[in-house]
Regions:
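Short glycine-enriched, charge-decorated loop/helix-capping segments at active-site entrances
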Residues: 40-44, 146-152, 220-228
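Short, well-ordered coil loops that connect the C-terminus of an alpha-helix to the N-terminus
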Residues: 31, 35, 151, 199-200, ...
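Conserved AdoMet/S-adenosylmethionine-binding subsite of the radical SAM
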Residues: 60-75, 84-211, 217-218
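N-terminal [4Fe-4S]-dependent radical SAM core
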Residues: 1-26, 30-46, 61-70, 262
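Auxiliary Fe-S-binding modules of radical SAM enzymes
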Residues: 1-15, 176-264
Length: 264
């Protein structure tokens, strides 16, 4: 029985996959994104331990919300932090879910793809029980990506290609930060990359916000994006046009923020 370190749980998520989702935020992330709104999930020191079996049992209590007439089928989404750090735990959890025909989604930045702590055999096993990957594509330029996140983007792009080649459905997300991730050149480069992938069924551009700033301050971490504004509606429309999102497409505009509730 595998145990995982869980930061918090959300029983009625509406933005992390199709339908109503039971969202599990895991503890631990190797990236240090300058606009991160969940910096308290970076280390493995917080959170609480759960077995995959007890966590699935907890999530399955909400199954009646997952199959509402006239709505997309919901299910379970595992987010972070970076869930690939706990791939064995997620694999066991998703295996239990698939035994009950529950839709599974993995919200990941893909930063450790190909690394020793994520064996390829283990990743492939995880993908066998994952229906949808929510891939956070942060920045196309390698140098800017390293400055923005502290890590290289080559593994992320490689993982996206692997997912495409192996027929795994992806929703791709990109946070639009004025002056950092919104240049015309880079958004066009992103569009070209996305056009090369065969299994991307949705692209979401999310406006940068400062909802997590208080968390940085509480943790004593300098907030390096102080003074950076939230993009305007017009700037978001321009970015969407460059990436190729059809006009009139409506997305939520924000990612989930863990509440700290573990429901235990």
């Amino acid at each position: 029985m595998t145990r995982g370190k869980v930061h918090s749980l959300e029983s009625f998520g509406l933005v992390d996959g199709p339908g109503v989702r039971y969202v599990i935020f895991l503890q631990g992330c190797p990236m240090r994104c300058q606009y991160c709104h969940n910096p308290e999930t970076w280390t493995t020191e917080g959170g609480s331990w759960w077995s995959a079996e007890e966590l699935f049992r907890q999530a399955y209590r909400y199954k009646n919300y997952w199959k509402k007439k006239g709505q997309a089928h919901g299910g379970i989404t595992v987010s972070g932090g970076e869930p690939l750090l706990q791939w064995e735990f997620v694999t066991e959890l998703f295996t239990l879910a698939k035994e009950k025909k529950v839709h599974t989604a993995l919200d990941t930045a893909g930063s450790i793809f190909g690394a020793s702590r994520l064996p390829m055999e283990g990743f492939e096993r995880l993908m066998e029980v994952t229906d949808l990957i929510l891939l956070d594509l942060k920045e196309m330029n390698p140098q800017k990506h390293k400055k923005l996140t502290g890590m290289e983007n080559a593994p992320i792009l490689e993982m996206a290609r692997w997912l495409s080649d192996h027929g795994k459905e992806m929703w791709v997300r990109h946070v639009v930060v004025p002056g950092l991730t919104d240049s015309r050149e880079e958004l066009l480069e992103m569009k070209a990359f996305l056009d090369s992938l065969k299994t991307v069924t949705r692209v979401e551009l999310l406006p940068y916000h400062t909802m997590g700033r208080a968390k940085w301050e509480n943790l004593g971490i300098p907030y390096v994006l102080d003074g950076v504004p939230t993009p305007t509606e017009e700037e978001m429309k321009e970015a969407e046009a460059l990436v190729g999102i059809p006009l009139g497409t409506v997305f939520s505009g924000f990612l989930s923020v863990p509440s700290g509730n573990t429901e235990k």
